[in-house]
Amino acid sequence: RLFNNEYEYVDFDRNSYGGRVRFGKAISDWSSLNFRYRYENITIDQLKLAASEVFSQGTDEISSIGLGVTYDTRDNFINPSRGISTTFNIEESNDIFGANLFYTKYTADFAKYYSIKRNHTLSYKIEGAFIDFREIGDKIVVGERFYLGGPNNLRGFKASRISPRRLLSTGNFVRIGGNKYVFNTLEYLFPIALETGLRGILFVDAGNTYDESKNIDYNPIDMRKDVGFGFRWLSPMGPLKLDFGFPLGERKSGESKYEVQFSIGSLF
């Protein structure tokens, strides 16, 4: 699969192009192995607020191979009501494959779905990742670092706003991203108008990103949290998701009382 992406973060722009190849092999009724190759050319530019003090600006090349294992007993991939899904992946990018950005990345997730009664589903999901960068010099290479916030994780916050911060000489802060993160969510999906495919959802999210100076901390005080509600519609284009998230606890500068998130994807 080929791609060409442009993404504007708060403190920089990330532009990339490349491709991915993936193939898998079933090892049982519920388990599979997958192998991946990824090439991506990443350009970081438009640094803001003197962020060049800490960020490495320019172009990096990722050339990586990956191995993953999946165990999945869900009764439906788009709208599961029971079962579990868990994955573990490792990705290696180094000069052997032609990269100039060297790292090893580990990612894992686990989800459990409970059928409370007909068309009522409770789910819990936890995911996390760790990336070990090598030979990157004094400045931070942000292209592969982790940010939370947005429609796919902490829905009470703007996209990519949850991140460790670094103080600049100007007195401003920049979000440097984490080399690790953890995210949890508890969701309850219920019918509103089944004949049209419309459902409602209640959710609680908790998670955070951490830089090299900190370990992942499961202390609730250290995690950013939100609650909210939303709607799911199985449209002809696929599942549509509209969520209203409300952050809990003390808000930092630039954070709103609530966020509205829209996306297309699975119901959960």
Feature map (PLM): residue ranges:
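Transmembrane beta-barrel strands of outer-membrane/channel proteins
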Residues: R1-N4, F35-N41, I84-E92, A108, ...
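Gram-negative/organellar outer-membrane beta-barrel architecture
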Residues: R1-P80, I84-T87, L154-G156, S160-L167, ...
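Transmembrane beta-barrel strand/turn architecture of Gram-negative outer membrane proteins
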Residues: Y17-F23, T86-N94, L101-R134
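Residues on the lipid-exposed face of transmembrane beta-strands in outer-membrane beta-barrel proteins
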Residues: V21-K25, L67-Y71, A108-K112, I126-G128, ...
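Repeated loop/turn-to-beta-strand initiation elements of outer-membrane beta-barrel proteins
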Residues: D29-F35, D75-I78, K117-L122, L194-L198, ...
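Outer-membrane beta-barrel and related beta-rich outer-membrane complex signature
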Residues: I42-L49, R134-F146, E212-I216, G254
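Extracytoplasmic gating/loop element in the C-terminal half of outer-membrane beta-barrel translocons
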Residues: N119-F203, D211
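C-terminal beta-signal and terminal closure region of outer-membrane beta-barrel proteins
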Residues: S213-F268
